[in-house]
């Protein structure tokens, strides 16, 4: 059997998935959906989760589910929980040191989005001591992985570079990989 069509990347649509930043995590089952599909489902009045058919959750229930999945070492849930602490979402107080700890755990579990968030917090000294060398090492490893976050990592490396020629090199690579 030979495939005549390209493999569908998204779980609900035929559009190829963009960078992971365009994915929406469904907390009820920790599955991701592309942002465009999530918006279309909302416009059409489909408020159930397209995967597990769960009813929409309140902020408290969503937080409880996130903590449940994070306790089971779901990398996406740990990263999302870190983002909630960083921004103060779901009724949480902003707690940057807790966000850093959660991002570090998500990085250990292999979440690329957490690498970007942790690297940015380290580079800015947000919730932790400023450590541009560690941030650059995180971004360098992510860039070499050539995943969907590689252009973001190259852009961040360009921002951290002290030499203008190195910065231009990283920004050129980011642009070549689709970062705009």
Model region roles, listed by residue range:
Residues 1-25:
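Proximal pre-RING flanking segment of RING-type E3 ubiquitin ligases
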Residues 10-13, 25-26, 34, 49-52:
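Short cysteine-rich clusters marking metal-coordination/redox-active sites
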Residues 28, 32-45:
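Cys/His-coordinated zinc-finger cores
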Residues 30, 71-75, 87-89, 108-112, ...:
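Short helix-capping/linker turns of helical repeat alpha-solenoids
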Residues 69, 105-106, 141-142, 173-174:
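Canonical positions in the second alpha-helix
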Residues 78-87, 92, 115-124, 154-162:
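Hydrophobic face of amphipathic alpha-helices that form TPR/SEL1-like repeat modules
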């Amino acid at each position: 059997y030979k495939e005549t069509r390209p493999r569908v990347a998204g779980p609900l649509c035929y559009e190829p998935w963009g960078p992971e930043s365009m994915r929406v995590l469904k907390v009820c089952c920790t599955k991701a959906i592309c942002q465009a599909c999530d918006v279309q489902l909302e416009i059409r009045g489909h408020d159930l989760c397209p995967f597990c058919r769960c009813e929409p959750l309140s902020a408290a229930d969503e937080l409880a589910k996130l903590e449940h999945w994070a306790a089971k070492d779901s990398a996406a849930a740990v990263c999302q929980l870190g983002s909630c602490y960083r921004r103060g979402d779901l009724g949480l107080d902003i707690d940057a040191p807790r966000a850093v700890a959660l991002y570090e755990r998500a990085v250990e579990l292999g979440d690329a989005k957490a690498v970007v968030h942790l690297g940015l917090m380290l580079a800015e000294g947000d919730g932790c001591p400023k450590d541009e060398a560690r941030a650059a090492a995180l971004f360098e490893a992510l860039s070499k992985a050539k995943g969907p976050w590689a252009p973001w990592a190259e852009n961040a490396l360009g921002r951290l570079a002290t030499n203008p020629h190195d910065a231009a090199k990283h920004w050129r690579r980011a642009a070549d990989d689709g970062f705009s």
